[in-house]
Amino acid sequence: MIKDDRIYQVLLKYNFDLFRGDKNITEYMREHCNQFYCDICDAVKGDNSFLGEDFVNLLKDELGELQDICLIIPEILELNDRGLIKATYEKGFQLFERMKPYFYTRYSWRENGGFYYRIRQGDFRIKAGEDSKEKKMQLFHIKTTLRNRVGAYRYSVAGSPCLYLASDRELAWFECGMPKQFSYCQMLIDEDNDNGLVLVDFSFRPVDVLSSITCWLLNARLQDKKDVDVYYKFLLRYIMIYPIAAACSVKVKDRNTKFVEEYVFPQLFMQWIRETDEFDGVRYKSSLNTNLVDGMGAINIALPVKEYRADGLDRRLA
């Protein structure tokens, strides 16, 4: 019964295996968002015996908002294609502000007890006569005085330092390009409770979400709990943020080009994160175009530099 719910089947279809092929990113996301919206509309008309009528009605009430989201994302990308950068940012920031109530968030310290890993190509071992503190800083984000070394990556534009960390050393190595010679460090984000860094969480995948929803609803119904609305809203939020999460997760077709169009939308999202006081970064799954990272439970986090100290490092991250 559970696996036959039409909404379940549609969501499992959208498993973040996102590759634009010969289409440009604007065309690809326009087709992908439109198909997602149409599939959700069809799904609410089908058999959803497990989720039930209450959830279906909740989702129906949000279909207009979902349609807007699916239309606005390609509009933003098209503005960027036309070189209208100011309009791109304005429309993007408006969308992200509008989406704030739907975003999942997670504190940084909740991952592996706050332990993360960073790898950089080269030898950063501390040798005799070297300043250990200065050497360790070289494994942190690039200082503001060395902005000329900052390239463009998924969540960062050239010249704007961003700290990328992984919850697993192996994933950090893959993300670094699998260098033969490298140094790594383990970092502890030792904040707790409500003091942790707040991350917008794009790491959820449909099989994980639906598995959790199934367990929660079965337990709630067996115990005659009245809080099933909480679980319905959790699933609703997943559906509503999927188009944005997808736009930030398209696999790169060619990393050797000077301009990577798959990075346009996630870079825009991170610029919004940089300017808001409510969030500190993004938690996300790897989008490397390789089966070596498929199925890994590890995640990445990206933390933009917001406020510099005198030594060129971020005031809160350092």
Predicted feature descriptions by range:
Residues 150-151, 157, 169-170:
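DNA-binding interface regions
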Residues 160-165:
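A short, exposed loop/beta-hairpin motif centered on an aromatic-Gly-Thr core
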Residues 169-179:
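Short active-site loop/helix that positions an aromatic residue
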Residues 1-113, 118-148, 152-154, 179, ...:
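Active-site and NAD+-binding cores of ADP-ribose-processing enzymes
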